[in-house]
């Protein structure tokens, strides 16, 4: 085990405890190895000096610039290249995935581009002229996602993906800038469950106490890197 792998294992052990640390670390390293094999150029790039005071980063939704008959991401790429190509170095695209609420921040499918905006080819075209940042919404997921619908239907793969609270739990000390309840009742095949929903009833918090959630999110982030996220 090299120094980086040891550091990774130490972090995993701190979060999940010593007993499962070895297995979880191995699962993460397996995914990193597959990513390195599939993306050798990305895997060999240096993480140092990637951002400096000379960078100019533009943050935008994918549909801020539109032209009839053209995918908004395609229009955005052409507009930015023409008008800001010599000024902006990086484009931070706010969530551009299929979603159900909150202007994109309730993601239904992390690996798809919202068809109303375009497709992955349009994202790649934007990345040909600019470095890209993707907005990864990995604290919660849409209630319409495959994962949460699987939870409701009793799919064992997703029963620990979300945080379920026992009735009567005292949550009076939980403070957040939202007027909605912190837990939302959902009817499942196993009866009503109180599910943790920090932001809204449609945005279901992911349960990182379950290492499977961490592994899935790592897979998603590596996928984003393979699609041009810098």
Where are the language model's segments positioned?
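Structured mid-domain segments that build the active-site/substrate or prosthetic-cofactor binding neighborhood
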Residues: 230
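Acidic/aromatic-lined carbohydrate-recognition and catalytic surfaces
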Residues: 3-218, 222, 226
């Amino acid at each position: 085990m090299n120094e980086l792998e040891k550091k990774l294992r130490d972090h995993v052990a701190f979060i999940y405890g010593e007993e499962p640390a070895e297995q979880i670390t191995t699962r993460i390293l397996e995914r990193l190895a597959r990513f390195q094999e599939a993306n050798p150029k990305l895997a060999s790039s240096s993480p140092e000096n990637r951002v400096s005071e000379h960078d100019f980063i533009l943050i935008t939704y994918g549909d801020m610039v539109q032209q009839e008959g053209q995918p908004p991401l395609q229009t955005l790429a052409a507009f930015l290249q023409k008008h800001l190509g010599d000024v902006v170095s990086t484009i931070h695209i706010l969530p551009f995935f299929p979603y159900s609420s909150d202007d994109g921040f309730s993601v239904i499918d992390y690996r798809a581009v919202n068809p109303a905006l375009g497709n992955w080819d349009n994202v790649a075209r934007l990345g040909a002229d600019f470095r890209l940042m993707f907005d990864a919404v990995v604290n919660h997921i849409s209630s319409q996602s495959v994962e949460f619908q699987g939870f409701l239907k009793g799919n064992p793969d997703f029963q620990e993906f979300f945080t379920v609270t026992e009735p009567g739990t005292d949550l009076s000390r939980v403070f957040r800038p939202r007027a909605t309840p912190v837990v939302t009742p959902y009817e499942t095949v196993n009866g009503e469950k109180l599910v943790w929903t920090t932001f809204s009833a449609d945005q279901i918090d992911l349960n990182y106490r379950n290492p499977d959630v961490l592994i899935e999110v790592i897979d998603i982030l590596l996928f984003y890197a393979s699609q041009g996220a810098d």
